[in-house]
Each structure stands twice: as structure tokens, then as C-alpha cells.
Amino acid sequence: MEQPKGVDWTVIILTCQYKDSVQVFQRELEVRQKREQIPAGTLLLAVEDPEKRVGSGGATLNALLVAAEHLSARAGFTVVTSDVLHSAWILILHMGRDFPFDDCGRAFTCLPVENPEAPVEALVCNLDCLLDIMTYRLGPGSPPGVWVCSTDMLLSVPANPGISWDSFRGARVIALPGSPAYAQNHGVYLTDPQGLVLDIYYQGTEAEIQRCVRPDGRVPLVSGVVFFSVETAERLLATHVSPPLDACTYLGLDSGARPVQLSLFFDILHCMAENVTREDFLVGRPPELGQGDADVAGYLQSARAQLWRELRDQPLTMAYVSSGSYSYMTSSASEFLLSLTLPGAPGAQIVHSQVEEQQLLAAGSSVVSCLLEGPVQLGPGSVLQHCHLQGPIHIGAGCLVTGLDTAHSKALHGRELRDLVLQGHHTRLHGSPGHAFTLVGRLDSWERQGAGTYLNVPWSEFFKRTGVRAWDLWDPETLPAEYCLPSARLFPVLHPSRELGPQDLLWMLDHQEDGGEALRAWRASWRLSWEQLQPCLDRAATLASRRDLFFRQALHKARHVLEARQDLSLRPLIWAAVREGCPGPLLATLDQVAAGAGDPGVAARALACVADVLGCMAEGRGGLRSGPAANPEWMRPFSYLECGDLAAGVEALAQERDKWLSRPALLVRAARHYEGAGQILIRQAVMSAQHFVSTEQVELPGPGQWVVAECPARVDFSGGWSDTPPLAYELGGAVLGLAVRVDGRRPIGARARRIPEPELWLAVGPRQDEMTVKIVCRCLADLRDYCQPHAPGALLKAAFICAGIVHVHSELQLSEQLLRTFGGGFELHTWSELPHGSGLGTSSILAGTALAALQRAAGRVVGTEALIHAVLHLEQVLTTGGGWQDQVGGLMPGIKVGRSRAQLPLKVEVEEVTVPEGFVQKLNDHLLLVYTGKTRLARNLLQDVLRSWYARLPAVVQNAHSLVRQTEECAEGFRQGSLPLLGQCLTSYWEQKKLMAPGCEPLTVRRMMDVLAPHVHGQSLAGAGGGGFLYLLTKEPQQKEALEAVLAKTEGLGNYSIHLVEVDTQGLSLKLLGTEASTCCPFP
């Protein structure tokens, strides 16, 4: 499904509080731009807050200044000018404060969500969800201006929230519904019936909250999202040059101004609320400031006075999204676990993870970006993220475990965790990288002082159980009433003699029976509190290790998808590997799968995936993906594949590939050769159809006696493409086809006879001699181009080889072979009265007639079903590929369904469709062919379809299943004798063909179909489309002249013609005629 049009952001800014994280988060924004989550032209900026406690308002003002500076510079100005805001859509995202459950903050907390329609596979963070909401849901339709969005909440917004921007000015807040009880700990808006904001309450009284209740019984919560019009943004930007608000920006800080802390909602926006008076506003304090000294209050009052002067006359309105939802990400582990799990779910959520024993994951648990090897048991309501674990491990209910690797698994063996939060952290202490671990209880409070808990028990009980003392954790002067979890020096970060692991904290869960050894080791370690640990976290290493683990599990997934033959697309994963700069490990994995595959289908798909990786690495440059694949440099690996040595072939391909990686043009050519290698394996799979080719020896016709084979054309009514290898044996194919005469004639034929000369005389073309191409093969060298489809007579040469008359690699000369077995040579003519690229199956049916005539001339009879498989074999020898529907349609009489199962060897079975009496004549009266005048170019269409199938693009896989399913429905339409039902089948069949091969409907054909639409039940181009014949089921009988008149009135249709068509009930016919002189001799 196509993504709706979103906001084309001019600038996206991500604010963060740590200077050393700016570059890290800048890269994260750039990665998202490469993934196409952010428009290519958007300016991306990660901006450090000028001071750690600058507040959401100060961070907004600083970010707005930085955006204006960059846009001013880009526009060629030498000073900041607010004019640049007039045509800009700016998005400011605030990272906010530290989060106890993710080292990279609430923005980069991973959610148990997968986006199956994303072009690039990736973990979904809260930031990604908010970007999507802002770009595609809240942002569209807004005028130029500045959107500001916190990242400390989980939001859900419907696809069309119904926000009107008519006559908008000022600022607009987005509110989402919540219960009055939830609002007691949050912000809530009071508005008038028109949506004008009257006041904003934070942790309001019951009476205040009741005033905000809407008719639905809910209250509009402060959601953390606000929009400033250009005018309001200019007013806000103007404050950055005046004290004390200049201290909110990096310019003020660089000038030595004293920092000031401002709230976006309770300072900047609050002054715009209608009911707020100047006096109340000036003495108020934002909730994030807390209680402080009078000096701070006076400084803040001055800042608020300035905001009042600039912004008071700007209207503040609210957009209430009644069907959305809002959840603030608190420091409660219980609430966090609840937000990441589905308590009533029937099973576990497994996202971007590979789990060997899924049955050990309890319902209502969640696993994100993990590799779990062996027995890893996970209890209900528990969450595993970014872990590579090796069992046996038992994680009970109510746990959060993140950031552990295989080296840490041993510490968890033989122990059950319950109601705990265990995290591994990347650190950088005095410039040296390291690992630290934190362990807390699910029920522990990060805010409570004094009567708090640790590991879910009161501090006193913890001290008693472990031997830890208060002075181990806090300074001696700290009073018991001041004990709190964030300041407790609990967590070892460095041990004097060994590496640290989870065991350095897990000992605290039990009464000690080791004589105090663990306690002594803990005391001997350098320990930090959670607050002290935050500035030491290495966020670059954290994100790098998450990315590494994501790709490690992705390689396991790729291997499993290929080896288990799953219909999952690896294209998004391929794009991820290429765009994040690590295609090498993926290529190595694909090589391993291809080399070790016992199934040519699995190996061919793996090679097609390699071709996809190379194509993606070219990034749209270097030419078209479809093209020649016969460069001499690649012949050595191809030769290994041809002789069945898959492992050597794959290795040789990889060695050659390494020489073609330096620039896009070479990458594209290498991709073509990998597709060529895949074709070799497809060919070997299809060759298995030879199992079902058998001949019966009969009397040899006399020298000079002609054997004539004639065939109708075929029209496909449903299921085409499903017969094409590899779909035919990977998905299983089903095609309904009709054998048809065109203008009363059977247009395809061949004749063969023995001649005394030990040579092969070949003639190709219509029966009229002046158009015939004549070829004489006197030696084996004359046959060597049998596998080059465009070489003159290639199909006829391949027919001699496939019929076993000539052995092209024999040491015997051609004349010796012919004299020894047949006492002379052969003459073979083939003809078709249909134009090239007709779409009526000409070449495959021609191959069938040529084989039938040749075999009979050589004293053998081939059954029609055997002949169907023989043509499959011949077309692989000829290297044109192709499916089985054409020969089934033309060689077998009447109306029938051909089917092949999802297995090798490839076998085609044919079922005749019985229709009501008189229906064939009725069909003849309503069926017409229109030659469009356009030649179909099926070769590139075929390559594109195979590429899409091997990539298992979801739309193509779904469509392929629909093709097979509809064939059975179409057969039912014939059994009922219902023309309207068959017309519906044709119409939907044409839509399916277009989905399978985009580009198969030329504009002139579309115009012709539009003109004919009112007169027909249904219509479709024959075969793969792109040109050739259009067939129609007319509403009225015998409409040839009427439709000729309709088309004659339409300009620009080109050289078209309308033809009568009737169902042929004979199929392939074979006759022996008398002897006569050759019509094409003397040969040159």
C-alpha cells in the first residue's frame, strides 16, 4: 500500500542534554533519512541543550534559534533573519531527561512493533513512531511553522485526525483523551466550546480537572505536541536577544549569561491561555522547576514578564483527537512493562528476533531484537530486548532484561529471575570503554525518599540480607529520610582484578552462604550510583551494539527464510544492510546458503538475493538491472554450476564478484551475472520435466515422406505467470487456457521428412516461400548456436538436439551420426501465421509441433502430455526459459486447466473442463481477438517478474496465490456457462497481470480498452501483455463489424485489426503425406 503524502520537512531538530551524544543522535537521524523515513532534502540537526536543566521551553527557544541560523546561512544571509521561517516546516523533537530503562532515553526505546510495509527493515523506536505520527498524521495540512514534539510519551493517533487549519493563527496544542484519574498526575487543558485554551493545569485539583471534562467523560491531556504559526515563532525567536531569555540559548551561554529554566507548556504557552492574568502568571512556577530560592524566582519572573510582552496577544487553540491515546513514559518499571506487553495476548510478541525454542516464551511476554539459543524461558509480562543469550535460562514473570550478550548468559544459569530489571550498559570511564550492569526491582521507586525499597524489599531488609551498609551507598552525613535509589552507589563499574558481570549484582538476591566473598568483591569495586552512571554511558557504543545484534539476528532470519522456503521478502533486510554500510556479512551468509543448499530452488533464490544486494549497492545508478550475462570473466563459475558442482560454482562466483564492487556500473553487471547463474539452476530444475518424456518406437516413414503437425493458438483465461519456473514448482501453478483457431485457421505448424543427404535442412517462416529463412547444417559447428534464441533457426536446432536425433557434444561428425542412425539427414520447416510477439503462445506451440513432426519422421511417437514436458526441456536448452501454459493451451484441445505442484521433478497435469451443451458455440459468437499493432517484449517482463518473485515482494506473492485461486473460480464459470462471470474473471485477470508485470499495458492499448469497455463483459491482453493480441468477451454476439466501427472513430490507435476466434476441439494434429520435392531446395 502506498504511503500517503506526508510533510516535506525543511528542518528536523533533535535536542539532547549531553554534548558527547550530539554526533551519535545526528547519525541516527541520518540513518532514518537513508531509510526514507525522512525526506531526502530535509536538513537534520542534533542540538545540545545549552544547559542540562534548561527546561523544555529553553530547549525549544535554543532549537528554534539554531534552525533559523542554518536556514539563514543556507539562504545566503550573514545574520539570523526570521524571514526564512515563512516557507519552512520545522519539527523540533525533544529527547528530554534520562530514562531508567533505556540508556539512549525514551526516544530510542524500542517498541515491540514491526512495519511490514517499510522499504527498509529496522527496529522501531518511539522516535520512529512519533516521526510517523508527525509526518503523516498530525502534520499534513498545517501551514508553514514550527512543530514541537516531546519524545517522553507513547502516542496513538488515527490516520486522519480531522484537524482544520482554516483561519488559523497563533499556536495550537494537540490534546489526547485521558481519564480524570490519570489527569491527576499530568497536565490538562481547559477550553471554551470553540477550542480556545482558557487555562492549563498540572496535577490540578479535583475541581480544576472536573471543569475540563468533555461530554465523553474524558479530559484533554497535555500530549507534548504543539504547533507555532510563523508569526508566533517569530515572536518567540525575537526573545533570544533580550535578557534573561537570552540565557536559554547557546549564544547567551557563550556570552556568560546566567542560565534560566523555562517550561514549554507552563511558561511559554501558559501566558497565551485566555483566562490567565498577568499577576498570576508572573508569580507562578513551572512544575519542572520545583521549589527554589527567592533569587531564582525573581529571575524567572523577569523571564516570564518578557514572554508576556511578546506572546500574550497570540491566540492559543486546541485540537482534540478523540480517538487517539496518550501514555507518559514514567519511571515505574511496572507501567513500562505493561506498555511493552499485551497481557491478554494468546502468545508472545517476537519482533526482529530469532528464538530457537519459542514454546518456552509465555503468553503476554515480549522479545525485541534478540538471539535466543537453547532453552530460554520467559515468564508472562516480561520483556527481553537487545540480548544474545544461550540457555538454559529461566526469566520469570515481571522482568525487564536488556543489553546482555552470550558472555553474560552463564551468570543467569541455575537461577530464576522474578520482578527484576537487569540491564547491561556500555560505559566510557576516563576515555576507556567498559561494561557495567544495573539491577533493580520492578516495584522499586526511583522518586521516593526515605521509606523506599531496593530489589522489591525495604532498605532495612536489604541491608540485613546482604551485609551491605548505608555508608556503602551514601555519604555518612546522608540522613535515612534522604535515602533514595538514584543516588545509591550500588553498581560496580570497575574491579581491580577481573571483568565485571551480572553476577556482581545477582548475589544480592539471596542470603549469603559464601562467607562474604561476594560482598567483599562488591566493596572492592569502584561503584557508581544511577545518577553518576548517566554521564558515563557510551551511547554511541550502545547504539552500535544494538545495530550489530540486529544484523546478527537478521542473518539468522535470512538463512532460515531461504532454507525453510518461506514466502517472506528479504528485500527490506537487504536495503537495511546496504544503507547502513554492512552488506559483506549478508553476502557471505547468502553464499553459504547457496553453496549448502540441497535444492536448486533454494540455491537459485539465494543467488537472486545476492543479485539484489549488488543492485541495491548500485543505488539506482549503473544502468538497468536486466541485461546480458555472458561476460567471459564469469564463464568459469557458470561452468561449475552447469556441471552440477554448486559449492565450487558459488565460491567462484564470490571470487569474481569481489572484482566488480568498485562502481555502480560494475555492480549492476555483476547483478545480471548472478541472475544468469540463477537461470542455470532454474534450467536444471526444469530439466527434471524430462522424467515425463517418453517415446514409442513406430515404423520409420519412407525417405521424402512428409510428416505434418498443425496446432491452434492458445488464449489464457486465468492463472498465467503461475506456470513460469520457478513459480511453477515453488508455488505450484494453475492456468486455464483455450485452444483457438484465428479466422478459422490453425495458425501454427511444422513438417519434417528424411532426406538422403546427411545434413539438416531448416526453413523458418510463413508457408509463403519468399519469406522463408533457409539454413543448412553440414557439421556440428553449424549447430553450436542452438542456445542463442535470436540466432537463425535456433529453435529448430534445439529441437533436433532435444529429440535425440543429434548429439552436439559427440565425437562423431554430424554426417556420421545421421548416416549411422537414419541413413541420411532431415528437412524441417516451421511456420506461424501470427505476428511476432502475439501473446498467443506461438514459440512454445511451434516448438511442440516441431518436436512432434521430427520425432514421427524419426520413427517415434510422443504422447501429447509427454510433448508438453519435452517443450519445457527444449525451452531450457534454448535458454529462453518460459512456462508450460502455452504448449498446454495449444497442443491440448478445447478448454482445460493445466496444473503443476509445488515440487520437483516438475510435472504438468491437464484436466479438460466440461461445459454445458451449446456453450462452445455461444463462446465462439462472443469471443474476439484484436491485434493491437504493438509487439510484446516479454523477455524483460519475465526477468522483472522472476526478480520480484525471488524477492518475495508481498504484493507479488499475494497476487501469485490469487492467480492460482482464481483459475479454479474461472473453471467454475465455464462449467456454469456464464459469460458475465467469465468477463469478471478476465477483468480481474488483467489487473493481476499488471500487478505481476508493471509496464505491460501500453498507453494506446489502455485507450483501446477504454473505448471497448462498454461493449464487453471483460478483456485482457494475451500472454504476458505489453502488446500483441487483446481478447474480448463481448456482451452481444457477432460484434466484429460493430467493434471495427467503434475503433475506427478513435484516433491514435495505430495499426490494429479485429479477428474472429473459435475454440479448437482438435489440438495437435499429425499427418503423414506422400513424398514430394523439397519446397525450399536447392539450399544454398
Swiss-Prot record:
Q: Does the keyword Nucleotide-binding apply?
A: yes
Q: Which GO terms describe its molecular function?
A: ATP binding; fucokinase activity
* Family (UniProt): Belongs to the GHMP kinase family.
The organism's taxonomic lineage, starting at the top: Eukaryota, Metazoa, Chordata, Craniata, Vertebrata
Q: Gene Ontology terms, cellular component aspect?
A: cytosol
What tissue specificity is annotated for this entry? Expressed in fibroblasts.
Give the UniProt keywords, A-Z: ATP-binding, Congenital disorder of glycosylation, Disease variant, Kinase, Nucleotide-binding, Transferase
Function, as annotated, reads: Takes part in the salvage pathway for reutilization of fucose from the degradation of oligosaccharides.
Q: State which Enzyme Commission number(s) the record gives.
A: 2.7.1.52
- Kinase in keyword set: yes
What gene is this protein a product of?
FCSK
Kindly give the InterPro entries that the UniProt entry links to this protein.
GDP_fucose_pyrophosphorylase, GHMP_Kinase-Related, GHMP_kinase_C_dom, GHMP_kinase_C_sf, GHMP_kinase_N_dom, Ribosomal_Su5_D2-typ_SF
Q: What is the protein's given name?
A: L-fucose kinase
Disease field reads: Congenital disorder of glycosylation with defective fucosylation 2: A form of congenital disorder of glycosylation, a genetically heterogeneous group of multisystem disorders caused by a defect in glycoprotein biosynthesis and characterized by under-glycosylated serum glycoproteins. Congenital disorders of glycosylation result in a wide variety of clinical features, such as defects in the nervous system development, psychomotor retardation, dysmorphic features, hypotonia, coagulation disorders, and immunodeficiency.
